[in-house]
């Protein structure tokens, strides 16, 4: 609740390892007016590429300080995930921990800033907030990666309908979401914050030498980003006589698959996986 003249806001996020949503959240936190807001950040773990970029004014609430969960719990999690029962794993192993951590806390607004587990955790602590928002960053109709965290599509829809507003980063994400869920909740589009000043400053930190015309792409190496299509495009350019480099900055679960695809298409000299870079702007 409001403390003095300050509004209390809680952000719920799985982690700050990497990814566009995580970077967006950190940028937002670094642009708050902390004379007007008290901000808490609920995280599973306090680690990741962006964890140290959270401003000191933000109070972190960490669910699990030990990232090495007991062997039995890990085995149960894998088994339940395999059989599509991961929500019940969260319900059994995590729900009470979250409720206990947040006991006595009161907020003007609670925001689950990512789809999936963040929304599930948010649904456990509705009594702690007056207003509830949830962010959707992707096309869930075509890439419904979150369904494993819920009992069913109906359950996931119900969690979204517990919110006062569902926020989307684009009209396309909003339209595809409504194709999937058709929620009655208020929906809004808020485009991603771009911290232009920081981008310009960091772009001048050092100079990168390019040997030829270069196309640089930045993003997580996951199916939704469709970097496999970029590799096929690179093959078309090379086949048509263009001497061109493609740099792909980012890490993710598809790194080995994309690396094999690059090798199989004989593009090792043209397409380069550069991994995660703390400064991708240079």
Predicted features by range, described:
Residues 91-99, 109-130:
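An aromatic- and histidine-rich active-site surface loop
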Residues 116-120, 131-149, 165:
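A short, histidine- and acid-enriched strand-loop-helix "catalytic/donor-clamping" loop
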Residues 97-106, 149-167:
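Membrane-proximal helix-turn-helix segments that form the acceptor-binding/catalytic region
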Residues 259-277:
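Nucleotide-activated donor-binding/catalytic signature segment of Leloir-type glycosyltransferases, i.e.
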Residues 6, 13-16, 31, 35, ...:
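Conserved nucleotide-sugar phosphate-binding/catalytic loop shared by glycosyltransferases and other
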Residues 41-48, 194, 218-222, 245-258, ...:
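Glycosyltransferase donor-sugar binding loop
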Residues 22-27, 213, 217-242, 253-260:
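A conserved mid-protein helix/loop that constitutes part of the nucleotide-sugar donor-binding site
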Residues 172, 193:
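Carbohydrate-associated surface elements
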């Amino acid at each position: 609740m409001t403390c003095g003249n300050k509004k209390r806001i809680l952000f719920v996020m799985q982690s700050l390892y990497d990814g566009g949503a995580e970077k967006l959240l950190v940028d937002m936190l670094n642009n708050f007016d902390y004379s007007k807001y008290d901000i808490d950040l609920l995280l599973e773990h306090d680690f990741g590429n962006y964890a140290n970029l959270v401003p000191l004014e933000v109070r972190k609430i960490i669910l699990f300080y030990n990232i090495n969960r007991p062997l039995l719990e890990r085995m149960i999690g894998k088994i339940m995930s395999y059989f599509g029962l991961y929500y019940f794993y969260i319900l059994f192993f995590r729900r009470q921990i979250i409720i206990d951590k947040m006991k006595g806390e009161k907020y003007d607004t609670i925001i689950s800033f990512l789809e999936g587990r963040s929304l599930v955790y948010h649904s456990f602590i509705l009594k702690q907030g007056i207003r509830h928002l949830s962010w959707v960053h992707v096309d869930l109709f075509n890439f419904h990666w979150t369904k494993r965290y819920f009992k069913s599509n109906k359950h996931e829809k119900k969690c979204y309908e517990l919110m006062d507003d569902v926020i989307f980063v684009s009209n396309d994400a909003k339209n595809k979401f409504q194709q999937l869920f058709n929620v009655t909740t208020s929906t809004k589009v808020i485009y991603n914050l771009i911290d232009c000043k920081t981008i310009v400053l960091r772009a001048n930190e050092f100079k990168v030498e390019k040997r030829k015309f270069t196309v640089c792409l930045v993003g997580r190496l996951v199916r939704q980003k469709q970097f496999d299509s970029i590799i096929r495009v690179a093959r078309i350019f090379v086949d048509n006589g263009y001497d061109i480099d493609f740099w792909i900055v980012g890490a993710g679960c598809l790194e080995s698959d994309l690396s094999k695809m690059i090798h199989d298409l004989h593009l090792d000299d043209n397409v380069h996986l550069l991994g995660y870079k703390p400064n991708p702007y240079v």
